Structures are given as C-alpha cells and as structure tokens.
Curated annotation (Swiss-Prot):
Superkingdom per UniProt: Viruses
Protein's cellular compartments: Membrane
Chief localisation class: membrane
Keywords: Coiled coil, Membrane, Transmembrane, Transmembrane helix
Composition bias, Basic and acidic residues: 181-210, 217-231, 441-456
Coiled coil: 216-248
Organism: Invertebrate iridescent virus 6 (IIV-6)
This protein's name: Uncharacterized protein 067R
Membrane topology field: Single-pass membrane protein
Length: 456
C-alpha cells in the first residue's frame, strides 16, 4: 500500500486571512461630558467613582434573617417584601426613614464649617436616585456625619427673623463680590455727578471688549470706498502733473491716465518735484556764490591784492561749482509740507533777498563799471541752452553790437578756418555774371555769346 503524507504549508502572504484584533475589556468605562459643563461636578474629575451602594447583581441574593418568611434584597433603597410560599401575592413594606430636626443655635460651628463648597456642588434635587447623590467614602458608611445634618426649621415660617438659612463659603464669597461691585458702581456714579471731567472719560472696559468681525456687506462697502478714494487721489495727481507741465514746458513730464497704477504715479510725481526743487535751490545758491565772489573781490582789493575781474572770471567758470551745488541742494531738500517756515514767509524772504542783491549789484556797477546782472543772466542763458560759457556761436564773433561782446575770448580763429564741415559746390560764377540782372535781356544775350566764344 502507498502511504500519503500530508504536510501543512503556511499560506502565502497574499492569501492570509484577516483576523480582527481583539482588545481586552476595560474594567471601567469613563465618560466625559462635553455639553452643559455648568452641571459637571468638579470634585469628580480625575477621581475614581466609588458608589455608595453595592453593584447590581444578576441573581438575587437572599439575606439570612430570623424570620424565615422575609426575603431581604441586597439592593438598598428598594422595598422589602415578604414572600409567602402558599400565596403568590406579597405585600410591600417601605423602609421608614427618620429626619433629625435641630435648631440653628444648637449646631456646632465645626459642623457648619465642614459644609464646604465641595459637597454643595452636587445638586441633589436633580435626581431622586441615591446613586447620583454626593459620594461618601467607605470609612463613613453607616455612620452619621455632621455634614449630612440638614437644618430644617420646626415652623413653616421661613421668612421669620428667628431662623436664617445657613450659607456655604462659596455663596458667602459670591455675595461679598456682588456687594463690593455694587459699592464701586455707587461710588463711580457719585464721582461722575460731582466732577464733569470724570464724566467725559471713557470706560476702559469698553476698549477691552472684542469687536465682532465685519460682515460681508461691510467688507464690500469698504472695498468700494477704497477704490473711490484711490481714483480721487489719481485725479489729484494728474491735475498736479498738468500744472507742472504748464510751469515747466521744457521738462519731459510723463502722461498718466485713470487706469494707471497709483503707486507708480505717486513715485513719479515725487521724483519730478524733487528734481525741480533741487534745480531751484541750485539757482538760489548760485546767487549766494556771486555775492560771495563780489565780497571776496572787495575785501582782498582793500587789503592790497589785485582782484579786479575775479567775479567776472568766476561767472564764466560756474560749471566747476555745479556738482557741489547739487549735493548741497539734495542735502537741504525737504518734501512738500515738511518745511518749518510757511509759504508766505519764504516768499517774503525771497523778495527781500532779491532786492538786496539788486542794490549790491548796482553799487558794484557804479564803482567798477561792470554790469554783474547782465553777466549773470548771460551765464544762465548759456547754461540752459546746453552750451558752455567758453563757447559762442561764430556769427557773434565779428559783431561788436551783440550782447556777448563784453566777453573777451582768447585763441579766436577765423571763420573759414574754424569751419570743418564739407560744403556742396555750386556753379562757378564769372565776372560777366556779376552784372546779371542789371541790364536788358538783349545785352545779356550778347554778353553770353561773347563769353561762349572766349571759352572756345
């Protein structure tokens, strides 16, 4: 006979059965109340619940008693029934409970102090079952404590002055706080009535209150207001740029539209205003320089130095001071609205300075016979036209009546030599053609024929 050997092979990983995990049962189930936490008993948090009654059992355990017909239940707070074998009926006999009534004066102070807020946190009126009442330890089971004594007056007249309800520490503290708050409010109201200054002061608690978040309509309205304000600002900047274009037509000022970005418009406007203010400050400092040149010429001339023509020479070389004057103008630049002096005062000072400058130039012209004002104006015109003060157009070199004849230029060249540009060659003119147009047409023809014969 053939023998068959059966070997058990473990299944492949892909075909393994899924076995659910089984966890061991917990001895107790803890629940946490998430709603209505005002009713949560604080002293039960983090503590093991010890019931005052033994746990329920599935089967009823009988307690041996002297009376064989009485069957006592193991569960407390249940009625005791008598069981008769012959009859299925039974009678319920409730447990008699006694209530000790004592007077307030006879109660010791230690018993009242023992009634702290911990036991008062339990609301015994919520549930009738004893299981939900305040827990007691096993040590005091079956014993009466002073804390369990309830003070019940003999008479039903609770509002009488002889019997007053006993309050716990928590209730007493709450009453004290309420009394203190009421006292503070009365004092504050009295001060407000007496002092009008105190009445105007806002309440600090109002500032601390958290404002509710804005609604969607409020957010949309704010966005619309922001867009309208931005458009108004753009129009104002466009108007200012148009004014600058009229005042300074030679300046290249860009054009913007209402669709342009406000930030770029603002930056461009600030840069243009800064450039113009720096240029005006440079021109002002040039006047100061000319005044300084004249003072140096007069002072050093009195000492004994030959300083004649110093101011005229410095006016011609004014470009050497341009860099320093630009740095000084940028250093002293202040944005619009940031000046210490108002516009009216600055305008009056400018008029006063120009008057003093004009008087000084006239006095110098009488003594030295040099027109400083015309020299200074000519240097300004040359600088604005883009040419240097040392170069003048060749048309004015030979003209003594031109206003630039006061300048004495060294190294002057002839007009023919100075011109280096290539010129187009025109038709050659003979002496015969010099009188062309002065005689009649017949004489012109004769002269032309003679000229042609001579050329042949």
């Amino acid at each position: 006979m053939k023998t068959i050997i059966i070997r058990k092979i473990p299944p492949i990983d892909d075909f393994k059965r899924f076995v659910p995990k089984r966890f061991s049962r917990f001895p107790q189930l803890y629940l946490e109340l998430l709603e209505n936490k005002n009713k949560v008993k604080l002293n039960c948090i983090g503590k093991e619940f010890v019931p005052t009654t033994p746990p329920l059992s599935t089967g009823r355990e009988t307690i041996v008693s002297k009376d064989p017909h009485v069957v006592q239940s193991s569960i407390s707070n249940t009625p005791i029934r008598t069981e008769i074998k012959d009859t299925p009926r039974y009678e319920e006999t409730p447990i008699k409970r006694t209530i000790t009534v004592t007077n307030v004066k006879t109660v010791k102070s230690s018993s009242i102090s023992g009634m702290n807020g911990r036991n008062r946190l339990y609301d015994d009126d919520l549930f009738d079952d004893d299981r939900y009442k305040s827990p007691t330890t096993r040590k005091f089971q079956g014993e009466k404590r002073d804390e369990d004594i309830r003070l019940i007056p003999k008479s039903s007249n609770i509002g009488s002055s002889k019997y007053k309800p006993v309050l716990t520490r928590v209730e007493e503290n709450e009453n004290k706080k309420i009394h203190i708050d009421q006292r503070k409010e009365s004092i504050v109201n009295d001060e407000r009535k007496k002092n009008p200054e105190f009445r105007e002061k806002p309440d600090k608690n109002e500032d601390k209150k958290v404002k509710p978040p804005p609604s969607l309509k409020e957010i949309e309205n704010k966005g619309i207001d922001h867009e309208e304000n931005e458009e108004d600002k753009k129009r104002e900047l466009m108007f200012k740029l148009q004014l600058l274009q009229k005042q300074y037509p030679l300046r290249d000022i860009p054009d913007f539209t209402i669709r342009s970005e406000y930030k770029s418009m603002k930056k461009t406007y600030d840069i243009i205003v800064k450039q113009l203010s720096v240029d005006s400050s440079v021109e002002t400092y040039k006047n100061y320089l000319v005044g300084g040149f004249m003072v140096c010429e007069m002072v050093f001339g009195r000492i004994g130095f030959d300083m004649e023509g110093f101011t005229q020479q410095q006016l011609l070389s004014m470009n050497s001071y341009e860099k320093l004057l630009l740095e000084l103008g940028e250093k002293t630049y202040t944005p619009a609205g940031m000046d210490k002096w108002p516009v009216e005062v600055r305008l009056a000072l400018a008029i006063l300075f120009n008057a003093v400058w004009f008087i000084a130039a006239k006095m110098i012209m009488k003594k030295t016979k040099i027109n400083i004002l015309s020299l200074f104006n000519n240097t300004k015109g040359l600088n604005k036209s883009g040419t240097t003060p040392n170069s003048v157009s060749p048309r004015t070199w030979g003209n003594s009546k031109s206003p630039q004849s006061e300048f004495n230029f060294i190294g002057r060249k002839n007009e023919n030599n100075s011109v280096g540009r290539t010129q187009m060659k025109g038709p050659s003119i003979n002496r015969i053609d010099e009188g062309f147009g002065s005689e009649s047409d017949e004489s012109r023809r004769e002269m032309r024929e003679q000229g042609i014969e001579t050329l042949k």
